[in-house]
Amino acid sequence: MNPHDRLLLDAARAGDTDAVRAALAAGAAPETRDEDLRTPLLLAVLGDHLRAAEVLVAAGADPNAPDSRADSPWLVTGVTGSVRMMRALLPAGPDLTQRNRFGGISLIPAAERGHVGYVRAVLAETDVRVDHVNRLGWTALLEAVILGDGGSRHEEVVRLLLAAGADPWLADSEGVTAYEHAVRRGFAGLARLLAAAQDRSGGDGRSGP
């Protein structure tokens, strides 16, 4: 690795925007990789270093470049829940169907973690598929219930997903719906939301993932 590429990686990791600009001006490659195959843009996203990320996007950095764990800058926005970073990457044309190592799109980890602002923004500002199913057989709706804490943030995430058209009858790979998971976990508020959504949808529409 040449010294300019190393400086760019270090600057992106630290969020040093001036150093990012200087490294690029000196000839550093926007798609250079560290030992874990992380690009400068991915390092900036992981640290939520917005200005550094914006400079890298302007230099043509790829929001879909995966690292050794199949994480990419775009996918990581769903993990961190950073709405401002999500918006910074949109001009770069992220692949909304890109999957992480679990087969999930960015919406799914955001729903799991209760990132209300991110879920609201990505549903409103992109064409992300609300009922995408990962390799575990879970949609964002299922994951919010199965791995969430049942509190107010996850209730709001479920409301947003349902309002965006999430199918409350979609079951996991074992045939269990989000409503049934909510009941099993003792999440009364989520169970009420999901039962009402099933009622509105008109009967048992379960067709599987």
Locations of regions flagged by a protein language model:
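Ankyrin repeat structural motif
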Residues: D16-L24, H49-V57, S82-L90, H115-A124, ...
